[in-house]
């Protein structure tokens, strides 16, 4: 028994000595290698050699793979630590700046609602709530019934204004119905239907003066004239032409165009309406050449011929001989005793009497005097000197001869 104990003690000492040597050798290898980030003891490798291999491929290549896995696990740990540190720093910074939109941490991020999306949704709702227009067209009977109702309301307004005017009250019924008149008669598709129901008679009643002789409100007059100017009345048709003549609307518009109480814009508008209707009714063209009749053109031609063949006023013989002074036109013509301006007329330049000249050709020239001859001679000399170039004269000591610039 003592021998066994001693043998066991020796075996344990040998193992301890081998372990110490392996530790020293392992540490030396680790110090020499720079690529490995951490110190790895070879004791673990020796222990692995003693253990039974779990897989068939437990060779040197397998050991290298295991080392790589261990290195990768160490790098992952460092990355996790860095992430944790960065998250903590970010949380600290967010708590200081009161930033709720942090990407780290367990806080729930609440995004503010977008205004543009809300506005777009509200606009869509508004359009969706609108009622769609009925695609079914109204029949002619329904349109006729509506036109008759409008005409009846407008006629009642005219009758009420007449009654109010006779009683001395303000006539404001037509003024209240004016928006209805503008709205209905401004619609182009309904104008033909209104003409068939006699709207021209209604408009004449709206424009004509009240029983006391006063004109309707200026807003009513201007609105009705504007409607008539834009109204489609096909006067080429005989039925429409007769309808316009029988309604008496033209007489009322003519009265407004010549009335002093009417404003100038309304008078111009009334004149335009009359000219437009009159040319169509009386078949007058708008060309300037066709606006005059043949008789008027003949009269204009005769006037031009008279102006061309008009002779000069007759002059007495005694006055014609003495032509030294200007002739007074008032003395030649018939003097009425009124000094007024006359319209200038063209004068034909066909003269029969030539005025006598003031110069006598037969008169002999008198002999010139000496001073006249000298003066002429000096003038000639000066002209000759000016024509030629300037020459400098020689100076004398006495100063008798001087330079002359002529």
Curated annotation (Swiss-Prot):
Where composition is biased (Basic and acidic residues), the residues are 10-24, 69-78
- InterPro entries linked: IWS1/2, TFIIS/LEDGF_dom_sf, TFIIS_N
Per UniProt, residues of the TFIIS N-terminal domain are 201-284
Instruction: Give the superkingdom in one word.
Output: Eukaryota
* Annotated Gene3D superfamilies: Conserved domain common to transcription factors TFIIS, elongin A, CRSP70
The Gene Ontology biological process terms listed for this entry are: brassinosteroid mediated signaling pathway; regulation of DNA-templated transcription elongation
Please list the residue ranges that the record marks as compositionally biased, kind Acidic residues: 41-56
Knockout phenotype, as recorded, reads: No visible phenotype under normal growth conditions.
Q: Which GO terms describe its cellular component?
A: nucleus
Compartmental location: Nucleus
Q: What does this protein do?
A: Transcription factor involved in RNA polymerase II (RNAPII) transcription regulation. Involved in transcription elongation. May function at post-recruitment and elongation steps of transcription.
Family to which this protein belongs? Belongs to the IWS1 family.
Q: Which PANTHER family match?
A: PROTEIN IWS1 HOMOLOG 1, PROTEIN IWS1 HOMOLOG 2
Q: What is this protein called?
A: Protein IWS1 homolog 2
Species for this entry = Arabidopsis thaliana (Mouse-ear cress)
